[in-house]
């Protein structure tokens, strides 16, 4: 009797489910008539359910920390930090990577301060980069909206939120009080952008600055400009800070770059709060080779014994700087290491059964 009862209960559940699916299908037809085809679909039928596409940051250690192999497409990203901490360099490096893959990028220069010579040194094809230098914050955000709606742009960078000045403020007198204008502008614009962004493969990055809150006695007095809307709508928030200067080997005065720390304070596509350290060389950008070396040590492709670094039975060099310099000269080896690391990190690659890397002897020895 218990088996018969169980069968009857299953049959009733099946009938109920079938009737529910019929009801949902009727509702779906009505919704599509009112709002268009695709207004209501199962997640398995949608690109949303197929995983998030990404674009490389230009650094393998940052790509790993981001959790999906780079910056997510179809999302809003905020990169913030103190002045001269490497924020613009991160975005220009991302533009260079997008262009290498045949993508299209746009730079909305609200600060009117983009240096094409520096951008070119970082690998940006400045001849193919779309540039806008808007007069007002409204103009900048409307241009961004049009670019997203076009569906032809892979990456948009807005530099910076602090420079998105509302038209009312520009037209007003210097001493006029314009409380909350920029915050309201950002809130309205992001509400519009978020909806259309999710239907595209466009990634939009906002560079933001840090301000000090007056009268804060306890806790962190730092905040970002433009109100709270950007914090809310961003899928990814990166805090960038300079931690020390990088000097040439054997000299304490010859500064050749900065070491920065990138902390992922918000991540809606992977686990947050990861930290990575990157080296930015003046006039060259993020050191790809330093990132490859750090990742290779972490994943046991390169072994460190004392001050010596080795790949299998072959010694690469003594001292971190010398190995980074060696990898910068041995481009093929660096590329092979990068490819193998990406397989290990992002595809659960079995490193024991792969002979991908071919070691090239240093002819100078």
Swiss-Prot record:
SUPFAM superfamilies: P-loop containing nucleoside triphosphate hydrolases, RecA protein, C-terminal domain. Pfam families: RecA (PF00154), RecA_C (PF21096). InterPro entries: AAA+_ATPase, DNA_recomb/repair_RecA, DNA_recomb/repair_RecA_CS, P-loop_NTPase, RecA-like_C, RecA-like_N, RecA_ATP-bd, RecA_C_sf. Keywords: ATP-binding, Cytoplasm, DNA damage, DNA recombination, DNA repair, DNA-binding, Nucleotide-binding, SOS response. One of its GO terms (biological process) is DNA recombination. ATP binds at residues 81-88. One of its GO terms (cellular component) is cytosol. The keyword Cytoplasm applies. GO terms for molecular function: ATP binding; ATP hydrolysis activity; ATP-dependent activity, acting on DNA; ATP-dependent DNA damage sensor activity; damaged DNA binding; single-stranded DNA binding. It is found in: Cytoplasm. It comes from the Bacteria. The keyword Nucleotide-binding applies. Can catalyze the hydrolysis of ATP in the presence of single-stranded DNA, the ATP-dependent uptake of single-stranded DNA by duplex DNA, and the ATP-dependent hybridization of homologous single-stranded DNAs. It interacts with LexA causing its activation and leading to its autocatalytic cleavage. Belongs to the RecA family. This is Protein RecA. It comes from Borreliella burgdorferi (strain ATCC 35210 / DSM 4680 / CIP 102532 / B31). The gene is recA.
């Amino acid at each position: 009797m218990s088996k018969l009862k169980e069968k009857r209960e299953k049959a009733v559940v099946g009938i109920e489910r079938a009737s529910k699916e019929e009801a949902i299908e009727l509702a779906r037809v009505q919704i599509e008539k009112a709002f268009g085809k695709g207004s209501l679909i199962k997640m398995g039928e949608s690109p949303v359910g197929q995983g998030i596409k990404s674009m490389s940051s230009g650094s393998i250690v940052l790509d790993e920390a981001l959790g999906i192999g780079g910056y997510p497409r179809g999302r809003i990203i905020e990169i913030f930090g103190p002045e001269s901490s490497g924020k613009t360099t991160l975005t220009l490096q991302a533009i260079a990577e997008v262009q290498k893959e045949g993508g299209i990028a746009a730079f909305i220069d609200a600060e009117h301060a983009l240096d094409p010579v520096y951008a070119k040194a970082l690998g940006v094809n400045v001849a193919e980069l779309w540039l806008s230098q808007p007069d007002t914050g409204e103009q900048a955000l409307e241009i961004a909206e049009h670019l997203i709606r076009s569906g032809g742009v892979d990456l948009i960078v807005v530099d910076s939120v602090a420079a998105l000045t509302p038209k009312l403020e520009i037209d007003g007198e210097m001493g006029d009080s314009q409380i909350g204008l920029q915050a309201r502008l950002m809130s309205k614009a992001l509400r519009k952008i978020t909806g259309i962004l999710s239907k595209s493969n466009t990634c939009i990055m906002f560079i933001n600055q840090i301000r000090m809150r007056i009268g804060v006695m306890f806790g962190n007095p730092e905040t970002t400009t433009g109100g709270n809307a950007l914090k809310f709508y961003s899928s990814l928030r990166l805090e960038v800070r300079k931690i020390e200067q990088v000097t040439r080997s054997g000299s304490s005065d010859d500064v050749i770059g900065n070491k920065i720390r990138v902390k992922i304070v918000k991540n809606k596509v992977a686990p947050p709060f990861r930290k990575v350290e990157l080296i930015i060389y003046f006039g060259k950008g993020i050191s790809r080779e330093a990132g490859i070396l750090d990742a290779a040590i972490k994943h046991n492709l390169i072994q460190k014994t004392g001050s010596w670094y080795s790949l299998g039975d072959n010694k690469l060099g003594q001292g971190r700087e010398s190995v980074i310099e060696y990898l910068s000269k041995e481009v093929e080896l660096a590329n092979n290491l990068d490819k193998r690391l990406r397989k290990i990190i992002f595809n659960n690659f079995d490193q024991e059964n792969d002979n991908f890397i071919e070691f090239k002897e240093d002819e100078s020895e």
